[in-house]
Amino acid sequence: MTIAKSRLLEVAQVGVIAGLAGGLAEVAWISIYGAISGVSVDIVAEEITRSIAPHASSSSVWVGILIHLTLAVSLGVAVAFAIRLLLLGYGRVYAEFSLVILTLTTVWGVNFLLVLPYLNPRFVDLLPYSVTLASKLLFGLVAATIFRIKRMRLVRVARHLAV
């Protein structure tokens, strides 16, 4: 395997980890909100399923969680490659966190203000916008932290090899 392919695979792997961690953080956040507010998180998962597969079976709660995590992993990989391209050689931590948070805020805006009102209006009304935005920002914070940890490990390895 060439060095370039190895680096691309490494970026994809960290994207998978960041996306999965961010997606799980969102599930945890919505679960906590549901426990406090009395909103059924099962309905949230079912509506995720209905957004993608409107005629899904009774196992739509688990399907909704699977769909959510699959989309989260895809988003994590996409953001990992965006960071790799846009911040190549730029070591400022605020730039990395800012780019990830800006990207996730944009994703939230497109989803909740453009796509979901058309695709599944019921889903948009399940939770307050502030809760869903906080969920996406939490995803961004978790993902950015993972990207930063990975970058710091690479810097340490490079310094170690240079010595």
Which residues are covered by each model-predicted region?
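N-terminal signal-anchor transmembrane alpha helix
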Residues: 6-37
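Internal alpha-helical transmembrane segments of multi-pass membrane proteins
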Residues: 13-15, 84-106
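Aromatic-anchored segments of alpha-helical transmembrane domains
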Residues: 23-24, 102-113
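Membrane-interface interhelical connector segments
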Residues: 36-57
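Hydrophobic cores of alpha-helical transmembrane segments in multi-pass inner/ER membrane proteins
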Residues: 73-77, 135-149
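Transmembrane alpha-helical segments of integral membrane proteins
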Residues: 81, 108-121
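Non-cytosolic membrane-interface motifs at loop->transmembrane helix junctions
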Residues: 121-134
